[in-house]
Amino acid sequence: MAIAPVQAKERLLWLVRDLPPFTILEGAAKGQGAIDRMLALLIEQMPEYDHDIVRVTRARGIQMLQDPASFTCDPTLMWTPERAKFVHFSKPALGAMSGGLVVRKQAEPLLAPFLDGAQIDLKRLLSDTQLKLGIVAGRSYSTQIDAILHPLPDSVLSRHYGNDATANLLQMQRLGRLQLVLGYWPEVRYLIQQQGGSLDDYQFHPIQGVDRYQFLHVGCSDTPSGRAAITHIDQLLSALRQDTLPALYARWLDAEFQTEYLEQSRHFFEGR
């Protein structure tokens, strides 16, 4: 009696980069980021695929998602109109604190004319001064922040393309080669501590006109395989995003924000 051949599983490539506290690829907390933990839970519950986790830069990850021959997913994507042309997105998975402006306190006087309370008028700051802003190439900082950056001349932006882009931008800032860095405070806080710096030397400013929270999605290649994967991922996220992910993210926040975040996270997905 002939035995039917075992059908090979499709290979799903998960694209990750070092993005603490979402994904942590090195050091004592390796694999303990909020999205690291989510990804492990998704993989465990998606046995229909062979899963590979691949480290890429943000720019390279976007290239791979655009390749119609590639079956790839990224668990840390923000929705943008441009990406929606070639990525099939999951429902929102995790609400995260929005990005903002990171400066060393010695540079604070330069910002004074552009502050409204703690919030910075980023567009006016970059238009009216000679200061350059460090950003990660290919990263979306939310549709609202992207809309501020898009019309600015390239001369005011210092783009970093490497694997450890934010860490390298902070190092440039510490050495005085760059005064402004765009980043997420939980990520920046983690990296400053990893570099042996003091948080007391830094100030974080939310950006005027930007919502307090933004939402990460899983995004897969917009192909039949990618769309099928997202259908399954959406089913799994319904419970994960309510019951599991908020606490995994909150542990990386400043202590005084943790309770407030967990309370607000209960309402993130009403109607979503």
Regions found by a protein language model. Give the residues of each.
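Extracytoplasmic small-molecule ligand-binding "clamshell" domains
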Residues: 8-86
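Acidic, polar ligand-binding/catalytic clefts
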Residues: 54-127, 206-210
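Ligand-binding clefts/hinges and TM-proximal coupling segments of bilobed small-molecule sensing domains
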Residues: 50, 120-147, 234-272
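Extended ligand-binding regions for polar small-molecule ligands
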Residues: 36-46, 105-119, 127-128, 132, ...
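Periplasmic-binding protein-like
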Residues: 16-20, 95-100, 196-234, 259-263
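Short loop->beta-strand "edge-of-pocket" segments that line small-molecule binding or catalytic clefts
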Residues: 10-25, 32, 116-143
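Short helices/loops that flank or line small-molecule/ion binding pockets
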Residues: 44-45, 54, 59-72, 151, ...
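Ligand-binding cleft/hinge of the Venus flytrap
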Residues: 39-47, 124-163, 192-199, 251
